Amino acid sequence: MTQDLLERLQAARNFSAPRVFRRMHEEAAEEGLPALGDRVRWWSLKRIARWQPPADWRAASDAVPFAQTSDGDLWCWYPSWATGNTPPVVLVRASEEARLYAPNFEGFLFRQLLDWLSGVPGAALDCDEAELESRARTAVDSVRPHLRSNWLALLDAVRERPLRRNERSGHLQFLEPEEVREIVQRELPFDRLNPGLLQVG
């Protein structure tokens, strides 16, 4: 069934989903898709294949949404900016042009975890830090089969740090957003990359 839907996606959108995404969906029946919170609400393969750009769409016509944020902004593959056969991932907000988030889908998963660890969403002042540490471990483990070993080592090291309260946002965090930007610029090089695109809804 999953393979049929992936083939339908390729036929409908003239687009072949990245290998990591295909494997993720093939394994999802047993493990479920990676839990990335409100930042990433995964679309079904059927919805991806059926999507058509709205009248006010300002991004490239070959963009392929695969998920959305809690605010309805779309995470899309963007073949127009592809390097070889590798489409980058962009964020498209309503009536806005695309903002590049990661040079590939694997980098998208990696950066999502960095963003999550830099400001745990919904953390009240009296929250249980042990619970948040457990959630961080679960979040990293959910992408473990899909990321390269050096990125996993970095994420594991970050989630082992003590939680700190960000004085400006009030969020608990394992690392500062400024450190995320440095990691993104080092690990996800791409001419159009927007390293300041953090803490999306």
Where are these regions (language model features)?
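A surface-exposed partner-binding patch
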Residues: 1-84, 142-201
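Short alpha-helical interface elements
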Residues: 34, 91, 114, 130-133
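Alpha-helix N-cap recognition
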Residues: 44, 103-109, 135, 150
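Compact, glycine/acidic-enriched structural inserts
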Residues: 87-124
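Charged, amphipathic alpha-helical linkers/stalks
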Residues: 121-135
